[in-house]
Amino acid sequence: MLSQIQRFGGAMFTPVLLFPFAGIVVGLAILLQNPMFVGESLTDPNSLFAQIVHIIEEGGWTVFRNMPLIFAVGLPIGLAKQAQGRACLAVMVSFLTWNYFINAMGMTWGSYFGVDFTQDAVAGSGLTMMAGIKTLDTSIIGAIIISGIVTALHNRLFDKKLPVFLGIFQGTSYVVIIAFLVMIPCAWLTLLGWPKVQMGIESLQAFLRSAGALGVWVYTFLERILIPTGLHHFIYGPFILVRQLLKAAFRCTGRSICKSSV
């Protein structure tokens, strides 16, 4: 059991290894837009230098703006027992299908689930845009769960022999067909349960902020006890704080922080 959990934790490092380079690109781009380092003339929005740096910065944000999709597609590389490339394709299609189901159910029965899908997908709304789909903001947690489900289906069904007249659906197509049916209840359960999970995460964040030394102890204990399993990412990811803000806020305000003389 422990070896399987460790294998899962190790599989998470495949997408994680994309972060260092992307972070360096974004950090350098923000630095090169700081007039304190390169001068006022080069940071003028109309200058060719500033425009090139902006273009490079936007490319650097690719990984951070698409983390759920990257985690979903990256996990089968370490978890699929065979044909890892085909498993990644099946996961990508199924992950997008799951998000489309969430969008359709939310738009149709949003009042039943207590989710307002007519609002814009902005911070605090509980919604996000994923590959052009307005869906629940399940972050990498939803991506990991869906990726795990579809990868398990791939491991079980990829080699299954079908009748000759259905041979065209054998392999990856068969996995995607079964996953399509599985994504319907998954989307339903996500709409039922995830809003409550979001409230729980917010409550835990509030506790860690306000509990002083006890909050620090709880956070550190949970992180350290999960390190042997490789699942400590679930703890420090959502809850690392910078002056009562998610650490992700630093990436959004990095430019203004660099320009500050304080």
Predicted regions and their residues:
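Hydrophobic alpha-helical transmembrane segments in multi-pass membrane proteins
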Residues: 14, 18-26, 176-187, 191
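Juxtamembrane interface elements at the cytosolic ends of transmembrane helices
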Residues: 148-165, 181, 189-201, 233-237
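Interfacial/capping segments of alpha-helical transmembrane domains
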Residues: 21-50, 92-120, 192-220, 224-225, ...
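Hydrophobic, small-residue-rich membrane helices and short re-entrant helix-turn-helix hairpins
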Residues: 1-10, 158-177, 197-218
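Generic amphipathic alpha-helical segments used as scaffolds and interaction surfaces in large
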Residues: 132, 136, 184, 188-191, ...
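Short, intrinsically disordered, charge-balanced linker/junction segments flanking boundaries
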Residues: 259-262
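Early transmembrane hairpin of solute transport permeases
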Residues: 2-163, 170
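Hydrophobic alpha-helical transmembrane segments
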Residues: 12, 135-142, 176, 180, ...
